[in-house]
């Protein structure tokens, strides 16, 4: 039987002060989305509401579906459906600037390579609150590649979050 090592990303492979990270992240998102009529305070409050719902996910839906269902309750199904591409654009174009709120762990790549050389299955078990695009971006900030891991948890492929036992 092959054994696995599960690594966390935020604060482990990718050093960060979570408060600074969140402030930078939400500030950039609010600025970007305000040009599409989103009120910054309402948007951030809605994101926290969706995040809270994801953390409480009972496992029936993916974390992604739980988040966007919550978002739709505030902004409506049609607007949510139409604007999801705008959020994807944010993650492609603006989210990379959030790297300035993170540090760098020079041993991260070496740790992952060593674990794989020892025959371990290597999983990035980061709390799946983010879409794949944002998680993969943060993996790159850590000097790693998504392909360094057998599995990377994201809100698209997960039905629960830490510390839920379903995770």
Residue ranges and their predicted role:
Residues 23, 65, 132-137, 165:
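Short, surface-exposed alpha-helical segments at coil->helix boundaries
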Residues 45-92:
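A metal-dependent, Asp-based hydrolase signature
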Residues 34-40, 78, 143-148:
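Short helix-capping segments at alpha-helix termini
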Residues 89-92, 96-104, 108-142, 152-153:
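Substrate-recognition element of Asp-dependent hydrolases with the DxDx(T/V) motif
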Residues 1-49:
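Active-site neighborhood of HAD-like aspartate-dependent phosphohydrolases
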């Amino acid at each position: 039987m092959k054994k696995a090592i599960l690594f966390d990303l935020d604060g482990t492979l990718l050093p960060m002060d979570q408060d600074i990270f969140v402030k930078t992240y939400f500030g950039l998102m609010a600025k970007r989305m305000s040009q599409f009529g989103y009120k910054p305070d309402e948007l951030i409050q809605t994101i926290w509401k969706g995040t809270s719902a994801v953390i409480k996910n009972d496992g029936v839906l993916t974390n992604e579906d739980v988040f966007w269902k919550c978002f739709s309750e505030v902004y409506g199904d049609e607007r949510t459906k139409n604007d999801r591409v705008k959020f994807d654009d944010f993650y492609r174009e603006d989210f990379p600037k959030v790297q300035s709120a993170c540090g760098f762990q020079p041993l991260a790549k070496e740790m992952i390579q060593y674990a794989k050389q020892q025959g371990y299955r290597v999983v990035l078990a980061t709390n799946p609150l983010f879409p794949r695009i944002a998680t993969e971006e943060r993996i790159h900030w850590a000097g790693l590649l998504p392909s360094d891991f057998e599995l990377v948890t994201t809100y698209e492929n997960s039905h629960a979050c830490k510390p839920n036992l379903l995770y």
